[in-house]
Amino acid sequence: VVRFDSCQHFYATVLAPLLIELKWSDETAAGFGLMGRDHVGFLIERGQQGASCHLAFRADDATQVDAFHHAGIKAGFACNGLPGLRPHYAPNYYAAFLRDPDGSNIEAMTYIESSHAANTSQHCATQQKALHSVNPGPEKYT
C-alpha cells in the first residue's frame, strides 16, 4: 500500500467489528488476525502504487456487516456500497463496501436466511439514511 499509516488505521478500524485485530506492525508491514488467535491472516506492506483490488471479508451475520460499514463511515472513510442484499451475487448475499485510502474496494459479506431477507431490506433503507447523516463527505485520510 502507498498510504501505509492511513491504510493501517483503516483496516484496524473497519475490521474490528469482524473480530479481526492488528497483531503487529513495523515500518514496512502490518499484520492482522482473528481476535483470540496468534496467527496473522492478512498483511499489508508499504509499497508503490499498484492496481487497486477487491478484498472480501466474511462476517458472521448482517449485524457485523452493518458495524463494519458504520465504523468506516464514522471514521471518515469512503462508502463504496451501502449495507444490503446483493441478489445479483446470490438471493441471500448481504454485503457492504468501503474504499481503503489507496482506493481498493473492501467488502464485508455474509449470507442471511431467506426468511429474514425482506425484513433486512427494509431495515437497510432506514439505516442507510442514518449512516450517511453521520458522514456524507469524502474520506478523511488521503
Regions found by a protein language model. Give the residues of each.
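Long, contiguous binding/interaction regions
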Residues: 18-21, 53, 63, 75, ...
